Amino acid sequence: MSDIGDWFRSIPAITRYWFAATVAVPLIGKLGIISPAYFFLWPEAFLYRFQIWRPFTATFYFPVGPGTGFLYLVNLYFLYQYSTRLEAGAFDGRPADYLFMLLFNWICIVITGLAMDMQLLMIPLIMSVLYVWAQLNRDLIVSFWFGTRFKACYLPWVILGFNYIIGGSVINELIGNLVGHLYFFLMFRYPMDLGGRNFLSTPQFLYRWLPSRRGGVSGFGVPPASMRRAADQNGGGGRHNWGQGFRLGDQ
């Protein structure tokens, strides 16, 4: 048990709380402590009955059962792996900036969910984070099932197809990829590559709540992966080795 505790405490703080909630809320629903009916994002209940908790619970809940358990575990792994890589990598020392990215993506996903009657938001938020990681490390070579290898920028779309095979739907993954692209475009591509204004800026109250541990620069300024490729490759990260021939989570 001490090994599990040490592993859990080693997870970056924001990812750790997100991971814990994504385990706890489905477990609460599975055990019947709270009816899962209260966890879904139902527009009528949220907008007209003022059940304001639903966007939060819909972000962490997933109906785990014989037909969905594998899909849940795969996406829980994606959450741990890529949220950890972002928080401890590109966002290292800047928890406020990382939390702002999650909040921006989450708000976009909630609005989309209300408009499209999407009742569960766990997969879209995870995929949006994975998409941002893939774009910041777009030229790294990742490995997938059966020894397939490709650039990281294609990983979100490969996973979209993979989740379609095991889950039968691509809407959640597609929404997550599009929201992740919106954040990446507004935060990086438009101001840095196209010379446009910066539309996204982390609010100062988040810096007061979660101060940067180094640098003290307001706003997130890590360049895209094309400028960081050598440093990242020297660090040895970025391999997605959990397919055939690799142990889950190997680097």
From Swiss-Prot:
Functional component of endoplasmic reticulum-associated degradation (ERAD) for misfolded lumenal proteins. Forms homotetramers which encircle a large channel traversing the endoplasmic reticulum (ER) membrane. This allows the retrotranslocation of misfolded proteins from the ER into the cytosol where they are ubiquitinated and degraded by the proteasome. The channel has a lateral gate within the membrane which provides direct access to membrane proteins with no need to reenter the ER lumen first. May mediate the interaction between VCP and the misfolded protein. The keyword Lipid metabolism does not apply. A motif (SHP-box) lies at residues 241-248. Keywords: Acetylation, Endoplasmic reticulum, Membrane, Phosphoprotein, Protein transport, Transmembrane, Transmembrane helix, Transport, Unfolded protein response. Induction: Up-regulated in response to endoplasmic reticulum stress via the ERN1-XBP1 pathway of the unfolded protein response (UPR). This is Derlin-1. The keyword Endoplasmic reticulum applies. Residues 32-69, 116-122, 167-170 are lumenal. GO terms for cellular component: Derlin-1 retrotranslocation complex; Derlin-1-VIMP complex; early endosome; endoplasmic reticulum; endoplasmic reticulum membrane; endoplasmic reticulum quality control compartment; late endosome; membrane. It is found in: Endoplasmic reticulum membrane. The modification Phosphoserine is found at residues 201, 226. Residues 2-15, 90-94, 138-154, 190-251 are cytoplasmic. The chain crosses the membrane at residues 16-31, 70-89, 95-115, 123-137, 155-166, 171-189. Widely expressed, with lowest levels in brain and heart. The modification Phosphothreonine is found at residue 202. SUPFAM superfamilies: Rhomboid-like. Homotetramer. The four subunits of the tetramer are arranged in a twofold symmetry. Forms homo- and heterooligomers with DERL2 and DERL3; binding to DERL3 is poorer than that between DERL2 and DERL3. Interacts (via SHP-box motif) with VCP. Interacts with AMFR, SELENOS, SEL1L, SELENOK and SYVN1, as well as with SEL1L-SYVN1 and VCP-SELENOS protein complexes; this interaction is weaker than that observed between DERL2 and these complexes. Interacts with NGLY1 and YOD1. Does not bind to EDEM1. Interacts with DNAJB9. Interacts with RNF103. Interacts with HM13. It is a multi-pass membrane protein. It comes from the Eukaryota. Coiled coil: none annotated. Residues 229-251 are annotated as: Disordered. InterPro entries: DER1, Rhomboid-like_sf. One of its GO terms (molecular function) is signal recognition particle binding. Belongs to the derlin family. The modification N-acetylserine is found at residue 2.
